């Protein structure tokens, strides 16, 4: 749903041109389709995708457990809420456990089968794009945005080549520079 709304009857009949210009110039932007013209961090809904990528990459099985004692421990950490520990994949999704998906993410991008983190991150980003993130879905809506799946080149530039899995750990829980349109999220 978009807000503010408008009466579509205003766009038919003799005054449709004038009415269209009024809507187009309305500072409340009633013609702005937020479903495709804005993007937002997907947040915890992304954890399902993170789990699927982990399983596809062979670093996660549904019975794999990870501990969570209030969050993922590093620096100030990625906080989590109260729930049991350790958790398997089903419990991690059911409880929306941040720590679990931080472990999975690092195991994907820091996997020894890749020559460096940039390569591992690139594989992860390719998986994310395969779910429809970071590219237009090809609808007939005008103004559709791609969303955003950051690249290792982006982080190389932002951190002058000095970044690692902890630097970008917020991506593991659908935060940080990751962005999708509401329609991309619904398509997932």
Set out the residue ranges of the language-model regions:
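Beta-lactam-recognizing serine transpeptidase/beta-lactamase-like catalytic domain environment
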Residues: 1-44, 49-187
């Amino acid at each position: 749903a978009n807000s503010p709304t408008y009466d579509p009857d205003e766009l038919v009949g003799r005054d449709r041109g004038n009415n269209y210009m009024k809507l187009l110039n309305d500072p409340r932007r009633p013609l702005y389709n937020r479903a495709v013209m804005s993007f937002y961090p997907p947040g915890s809904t992304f954890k399902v995708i993170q789990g699927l990528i982990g399983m596809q990459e062979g670093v996660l099985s549904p019975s794999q457990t990870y501990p969570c004692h209030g969050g993922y421990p590093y620096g100030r950490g990625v906080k989590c809420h109260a729930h049991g520990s350790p958790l398997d994949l089903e419990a991690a999704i059911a409880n929306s456990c941040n720590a679990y998906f931080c472990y999975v993410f690092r195991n994907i991008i820091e996997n020894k089968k890749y020559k460096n983190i940039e390569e591992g991150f690139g594989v992860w980003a390719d998986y994310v794009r395969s779910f429809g993130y970071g590219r237009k879905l090809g609808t007939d809506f005008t103004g559709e945005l791609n969303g955003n799946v950051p690249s290792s080149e982006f982080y190389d530039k932002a951190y002058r080549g000095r970044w690692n899995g902890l630097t970008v750990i917020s991506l593991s829980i659908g935060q940080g520079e990751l962005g999708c349109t509401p329609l991309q999220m619904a398509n997932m």
